């Protein structure tokens, strides 16, 4: 029996060796990509094609427990190159799960916590990354007294998030990177874009991120232009009657707003101007109940007061309960100790983010447009961030050696009619790296109303080439021109294609295995047949040699012996012949054997061995 000390030392040394080989990240408690894998999402339809998903928290400020939640969907197809679209909703403080489950994500929520497929999902040709931004929004969290106050701090934290995300998922770091979102994301996205461009200048070419485009829908980009557009839009839409007392009251408020903006130009928030929107909602209120006031996100609709659109869209009543389910919380890899229940918008984030002295993102666009294309799109029925304000923004903006959509002095880029599957969808207008798209009959959340049209817009902007994929392209035309095929239907997604390719390879491997087995069996049969044939040939050769020997012996005798034998035999086979024993006795045996040996071999013990050495 070995001494106890010797056994203990060996065991301890073995344990230390294992610890030495154990990954440092494991000892430190760092997560890997596998920890974020979404294994099973509750409510998926049975016929749903498989989509690879990852979700969870990434820490951005350890000192304040600041964590951003993300939900990543892999693309269905790769069209000529890899792309990733980061989607952000607005607020500030409103969750990007609105975008994931009501706008551009692959699923929509219905009653009974069921999911259905979105036929206009933006992950058709791009990986989709939804982030609840900034900290405290949606599933993201931070210590109560540590909400951020400004756009620069937000952008810095987002760069930290991306650094850690790409460390976990390096396969996406070299993708063409796009940012998309709506409403107050019109502030977030340009600030993040500027931070990325600044970062790229400090990195080697291999470490840079390929920022390839920005898409902002009904964006709060230029507060001055949007604040001036509330009244203009309301008069154009007939919400406020021109020349009425209500119109005069609002015009007075507009003058106060304009004065404040002239004193403090370029700010993000102007309380004096926001009061105009509130007054419009108040003046257009009718009675009580769920139809009391105008829906500020879609003026064709009405809502209860004082919500005036906050209860919209209708899918919202399903999204909240779905995301609060324990099994969904578990599936999305959420920290149960930190989860306080999903809220669409966090008023605390909003209250802390209102930094009136911040510089509006409109000031960043000219420099960004030197390097990165930007697409602004608007739903024509939105009031709060309406298309009139966006069009004023463009007209007043100077970039890339021109102002507005002027292409030559006095000539502006035309508004080109866009038709989608036979219907007039809106118009496109573009010049010098900036594109503007107006969606007819659409709300503040354009992809909610027109998922397939919005994806067609995305695909055109990203210059998607689907020629190598197959499927049925959509009929999308600008000024009657078909252009490249940008939307596809009926094609299998990457996961399905990979599974089928794997199955095909397995079948091919099985066939090759069967083929090899058949070849082996055939070789064995050939060898066996050859051996059997050789055996038969040897036996017949021996018989022929013996027969020839008897003939040779008989040829040297008198007719009295052999002639008598030959005349009497009924067959040439000696064993079958009937002959007279006395005749055979008279054959001179020794002499005939000597002659026979000189001409034939009748197979002594050494013959087979000698023959074997000469075969080639």
Curated annotation (Swiss-Prot):
The active site is at residues 183, 382, 444. Its EC number is 3.4.16.6. PANTHER family: PHEROMONE-PROCESSING CARBOXYPEPTIDASE KEX1, SERINE PROTEASE FAMILY S10 SERINE CARBOXYPEPTIDASE. GO terms for molecular function: serine-type carboxypeptidase activity. The chain crosses the membrane at residues 517-537. Belongs to the peptidase S10 family. The lineage of its organism: Eukaryota, Fungi, Dikarya, Ascomycota, Pezizomycotina. It catalyses: Preferential release of a C-terminal arginine or lysine residue. The gene is KEX1. This is Pheromone-processing carboxypeptidase KEX1. GO terms for biological process: apoptotic process; proteolysis. Residues 1-28 form the signal peptide. Residues 29-516 are lumenal. Residues 538-616 are cytoplasmic. InterPro entries: AB_hydrolase_fold, Peptidase_S10. It comes from Metarhizium acridum (strain CQMa 102). Keywords: Apoptosis, Carboxypeptidase, Glycoprotein, Golgi apparatus, Hydrolase, Membrane, Protease, Signal, Transmembrane, Transmembrane helix. It is a single-pass type I membrane protein. It comes from the Eukaryota. GO terms for cellular component: membrane; trans-Golgi network. It is found in: Golgi apparatus, trans-Golgi network membrane. Glycans are attached at residues 119, 357, 433, 441, 493. It is an enzyme of class 3 (hydrolase). Residues 604-616 have a biased composition (Acidic residues).
């Amino acid at each position: 029996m070995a001494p106890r000390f010797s056994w203990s030392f060996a065991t301890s040394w073995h344990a230390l060796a294992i610890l030495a080989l154990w990954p440092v990240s494991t000892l430190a408690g760092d997560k890997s990509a596998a920890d974020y894998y979404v294994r099973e999402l509750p409510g998926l339809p049975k016929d749903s094609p498989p989509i690879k998903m990852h979700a969870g928290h990434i820490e951005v400020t350890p000192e304040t427990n600041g964590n951003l939640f993300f939900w990543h969907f892999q693309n269905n197809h790769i069209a000529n190159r890899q792309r990733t679209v980061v989607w952000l909703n607005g607020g500030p403080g409103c969750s990007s799960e609105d975008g994931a489950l009501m706008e551009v994500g692959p699923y929509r929520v219905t009653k009974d916590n069921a999911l259905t497929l979105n036929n206009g999902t933006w992950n058709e040709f791009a990986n989709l990354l939804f982030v609840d931004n900034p900290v405290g929004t949606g599933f993201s969290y931070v210590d109560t007294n540590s909400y951020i106050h400004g756009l620069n701090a937000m952008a810095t934290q987002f760069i930290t998030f991306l650094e850690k995300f790409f460390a976990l998922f390096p396969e996406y770091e070299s993708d063409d990177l796009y940012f998309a979102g709506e409403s107050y994301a019109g502030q977030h996205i340009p600030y993040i874009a500027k931070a990325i461009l600044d970062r790229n200048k400090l990195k080697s070419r291999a470490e840079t991120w390929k920022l390839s485009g920005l898409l902002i829908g009904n964006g709060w980009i230029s507060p001055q232009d949007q604040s001036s557009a509330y009244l203009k839009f309301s008069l154009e839409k007939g919400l406020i009657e021109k020349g009425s007392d209500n119109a005069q009251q609002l015009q007075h408020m507009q003058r106060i707003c304009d004065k404040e903006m002239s004193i403090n130009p370029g700010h993000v928030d102007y309380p004096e101007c926001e009061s105009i929107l509130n007054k419009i909602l108040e003046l257009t209120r009718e009675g009580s109940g769920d139809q009391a006031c105008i829906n500020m996100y879609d003026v064709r609709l009405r809502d209860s007061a004082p919500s005036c659109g906050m209860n919209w869209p209708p899918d919202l009543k399903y999204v909240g309960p779905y995301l609060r389910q324990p099994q969904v919380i578990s599936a999305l890899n959420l920290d149960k100790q930190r989860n306080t229940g999903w809220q669409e918008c966090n008023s605390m984030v909003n209250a802390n983010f209102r930094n009136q002295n911040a510089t509006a993102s409109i000031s960043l666009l000219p420099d960004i447009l030197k390097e990165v294309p930007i697409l602004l799109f608007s739903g024509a029925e939105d009031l709060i961030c309406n298309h009139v304000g966006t069009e004023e923004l463009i007209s007043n903006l100077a970039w890339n050696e021109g102002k507005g959509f002027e292409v030559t002095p006095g000539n502006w880029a035309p508004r080109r009619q866009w038709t989608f599957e036979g219907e007039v969808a809106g118009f496109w207008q573009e010049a010098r790296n900036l594109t503007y798209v107006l969606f007819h009959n659409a709300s503040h959340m354009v992809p909610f109303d027109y998922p397939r049209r919005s994806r067609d817009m995305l695909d055109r902007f990203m210059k998607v080439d689907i020629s190598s994929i197959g499927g049925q392209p959509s009929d999308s035309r600008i000024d009657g021109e078909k252009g490249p095929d940008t939307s596809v239907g009926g094609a299998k997604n990457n996961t399905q294609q990979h599974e089928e390719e794997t199955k095909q390879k397995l079948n091919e491997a099985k066939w090759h295995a069967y083929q090899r087995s058949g070849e082996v069996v055939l070789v064995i049969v050939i060898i066996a047949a050859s051996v059997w044939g050789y055996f038969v040939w040897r036996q017949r050769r021996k018989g022929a040699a013996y027969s020839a020997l008897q003939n040779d012996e008989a040829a040297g005798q008198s007719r009295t012996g052999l002639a008598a034998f030959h005349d009497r035999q009924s067959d040439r086979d000696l064993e079958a012949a009937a002959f007279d024993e006395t005749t055979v006795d008279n054959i001179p045996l020794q002499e005939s054997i000597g002659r026979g040996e000189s001409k034939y071999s009748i197979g002594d013990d050494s013959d087979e061995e000698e023959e074997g050495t000469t075969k080639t």
